UniProtKB/Swiss-Prot annotation:
Example GO biological process: DNA recombination
Organism: Escherichia coli (strain K12)
Phenotype caused by lack of the gene: A double deletion with priB is disadvantageous to cells, which accumulate DNA double-strand breaks.
Subcellular location: Cytoplasm, Nucleoid
Pfam families linked: RdgC
Keywords: Cytoplasm, DNA recombination
Similarity annotation: Belongs to the RdgC family.
Name of the molecule in the record: Recombination-associated protein RdgC
InterPro entries recorded: RdgC
Cited function: May be involved in recombination. Genetic interactions among priB, dam, lexA, nagC, polA, rdgB, rdgB, rep and uup link the PriA-PriB replication restart pathway to DNA double-strand break repair.
GO cellular component, one term: cytosol
Residue ranges crossing the lipid bilayer per the database entry: none
Length: 303
């Protein structure tokens, strides 16, 4: 099932048409195809329901989920270096002279092309959820680079995608710091036992607290000394636990058992019905969480 593990959240900066029927055709033009013999990497769209459906989009209640797959050829540097050195040595022996740097650089490209067809592939998939009701796009990944790559693929598929990272009116780290300092988060949220604190100075230290009482004197002292909270583990209404980061991303989402088991009455053999029910449940909960979070963090920055 598609329960998201992380959320990189983006705001559509202006209204655009995002209808699943249109998107289906647009994504099909950039459907995933495997790497050819000389490709280092390929990225494209695959059905979010895997082998259970050919559709590249799945939609329910104005929520759309899509899935990008990436194939990357793995060529370890030592392998390239060894093959290159062997080729250079062979040519220098044959020609009885030292090769120039430009010649060596050209040889490196030749070596890469000769090794590529034999290289192993690494595959990864990234889910993306488009909330057309609230004008948000969420990417299930932990790095901004991966999220931007997936958004770039969608932008290329649609022709236009005006999005910006979701940002708050007040710096997130200052709000998180105040929550820890006061020992109380915004309504609906509860502090857990994990945080990261950073000094505002460039060469200042980083403190990572795990399984620790965040209201303790030790943590308070770090804040008084000028450190700010850049990551904070939170519980939302005893339904979802996550780590809030100062860049606006949510990491390590953990849905409570009660939530995950809510659709257990649906026959697991009926994959499509279960997928649909879980998708509706997950997006409904996460949309409410995001809205609560925006309010709790002091509101979204004016655009």
């Amino acid at each position: 099932m598609l329960w998201f593990k992380n959320l990189m959240v983006y705001r559509l900066s202006r209204e655009i048409s995002l209808r699943a029927e249109e998107m289906e055709k647009q994504l099909a033009s950039m459907a995933f195809t495997p790497c050819g013999s000389q490709d280092m990497a390929k990225m494209g769209w695959v059905p979010p329901m895997g082998s259970h459906s050919d559709a590249l989009t799945h939609v329910a209640n104005g929520q759309i989920v899509i899935c990008a797959r990436k194939e990357e050829k793995i060529l370890p540097s030592p392998v390239i270096k060894q093959a290159l050195e062997a080729k250079i040595a062979k040519l220098e022996a044959e020609q009885a002279r030292k090769l120039k740097k430009t010649e060596k650089d050209s040889l490196k490209d030749e070596v890469l092309h000769s090794l590529l067809p034999r290289a192993f592939s690494r595959f990864s998939q990234t889910m993306m959820w488009i909330d057309t009701v609230n004008g948000l796009i969420m990417v299930d990944c932990a790095s901004a680079k991966k999220a931007e790559d997936t958004l770039a693929l969608l932008r290329k598929s649609l022709g236009s995608l005006p999005v910006v990272p979701l940002s708050m009116e007040n710096p997130i780290e200052l709000t998180l710091t105040e929550w820890v300092r006061s020992g109380s988060a915004a309504q609906g949220f509860q502090l857990l036992d994990e945080a990261e604190l950073k000094s505002l100075l460039e060469d200042g230290g980083v403190i990572r607290a795990k399984k620790q009482d965040l209201t303790s004197e030790e943590i308070t002292n770090h804040i008084e000394a000028g450190k700010v909270v850049t990551k904070l583990a939170l519980d939302w209404q005893q339904r979802i636990q996550f780590v809030m980061c100062d860049d606006g991303s949510l990491k390590r989402l953990k849905f409570c058992d009660e939530l995950r088991d809510q659709n257990e009455d649906i026959d697991r053999e009926d994959f499509a019905q279960r997928f649909d029910a879980d998708f509706i449940l997950m997006t409904g909960e996460l949309a409410a969480l995001i809205q609560n979070l925006i309010e709790g963090l002091g509101g979204e920055a004016q655009r």
